[in-house]
């Protein structure tokens, strides 16, 4: 994976266009077989529609890119097979919950998910619900995913004005710090209480990061790169 590069931007210009994905068309049979195998392993996986990015450009404090619609099975195969189509990227938003004592709150993904055991901020691959007109609304995507996973709504946090875009070649994580006026312990307890009320929670737990010693190998490199940049040297 490419060494993470962090771009700080204030504006996202993400258009949604109609276009074919040759990777998905040319390898359809292989993709379907791969998804069938993954679905046997994780029966709750669903082949919905997602949005994949192309041509990310960072300039003048802005990230510009175009997105197109694809099926989740094709996206999953592309990811699992080492990103064979180099012309596209996985561009998604993340809400970096930060408590008033400086702790970051990350989710531990449940065993039934495609990323079981991984630890990262609430997020999700953009889908059709995140389209506004002919544009992708990453801010809305973050708010939706955060509420679904943790129960927190925009009334519970104060969002910073800018995004930290962590670019690692096949992915761009658009991370915005969301400041919550409670301690890390209280924030974790609130999220865990919400998880206990959910019938099928996406998260299995909450992991707090206060220092580099709290980072683990279960976190994607783009997450640890972002957190390291926020913590004291």
Feature roles, as predicted:
Residues 1-120, 125-144, 152-233:
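N-terminal leader/linker segments that precede catalytic domains of diphosphate-processing enzymes
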């Amino acid at each position: 994976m490419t060494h993470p590069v962090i771009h700080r931007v204030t504006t996202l210009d993400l258009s949604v266009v109609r276009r074919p994905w040759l990777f998905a068309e040319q390898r359809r049979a292989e993709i379907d077989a791969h998804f069938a195998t993954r679905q046997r392993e994780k029966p709750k996986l669903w082949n919905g529609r997602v949005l994949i990015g192309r041509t990310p450009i960072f300039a003048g404090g802005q990230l510009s890119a175009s997105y197109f619609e694809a099926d989740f099975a094709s996206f999953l195969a592309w990811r699992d097979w080492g990103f064979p189509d180099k012309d596209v990227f996985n561009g998604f938003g993340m809400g970096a919950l930060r408590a008033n004592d400086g702790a970051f709150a990350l989710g531990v993904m449940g065993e039934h998910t495609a990323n079981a055991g991984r630890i990262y901020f609430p997020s999700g691959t953009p889908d059709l619900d995140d389209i506004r007109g002919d544009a992708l609304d990453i801010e809305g995507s973050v708010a939706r995913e955060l509420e679904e996973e943790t129960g927190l709504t925009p009334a519970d946090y104060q969002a910073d004005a800018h995004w930290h875009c962590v670019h690692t070649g096949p992915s761009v994580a658009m991370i915005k710090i969301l400041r919550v006026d409670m301690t890390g312990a209280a924030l974790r307890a609130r999220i865990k209480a919400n998880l206990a009320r959910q019938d099928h929670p996406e998260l299995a737990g909450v992991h707090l990061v206060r220092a580099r010693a709290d980072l683990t190998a279960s976190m994607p490199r783009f997450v640890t790169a972002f957190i390291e940049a926020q913590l004291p040297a």
